Amino acid sequence: MELNGIKPSLGAKHAKRRVGRGIGSGLGKTAGRGHKGQKSRAGGYHKVGFEGGQMPMQRRLPKRGFKSHLLKFNAEVTLSALEQLGLAEVDLLALKTAGLVGQLAKNVKVIKSGELSKAVKLNGISATAGAKAIIEAAGGSVA
């Protein structure tokens, strides 16, 4: 067997369907579109969600609240992540370079998840009450 001799097995490849090319092709005249109606005409189809003039589902259902665009600027870091980071002083830049928070993050909060054995000083980073207690018990501080 050689690379230039490899071919797909018989019946594996099908010729592209050519519509509107005469009666003998089996796809002539209406070209598989049926007779009349919007879908048979040139110029495409209705837009997504259009229900023929009936009030669409998306507009019929009630709306409530909103999704805050500020959420993408907030981030959370666990105590176990701080433990693995192994730094004495942690700030926003250190967390970004370590990849623990995204580049868009502006507000970071440390949450109580995992353990912390060494002292860590947080600069410009907030912490939950439980996380703050554990950080201070380990000899660290939250500034």
Curated annotation (Swiss-Prot):
CC terms in the record's Gene Ontology section: cytosolic large ribosomal subunit
Region Disordered, residue ranges: 1-59
Pfam families: Ribosomal_L27A (PF00828)
GO biological process: translation
InterPro entries, per the entry: Ribosomal_uL15, Ribosomal_uL15/eL18, Ribosomal_uL15/eL18_sf, Ribosomal_uL15_bac-type
Oligomeric and partner information: Part of the 50S ribosomal subunit.
Function: Binds to the 23S rRNA.
PANTHER family assigned to the protein according to its UniProt record, in alphabetical order: 50S RIBOSOMAL PROTEIN L15 (PTHR12934), LARGE RIBOSOMAL SUBUNIT PROTEIN UL15M (PTHR12934:SF11)
Protein name: Large ribosomal subunit protein uL15
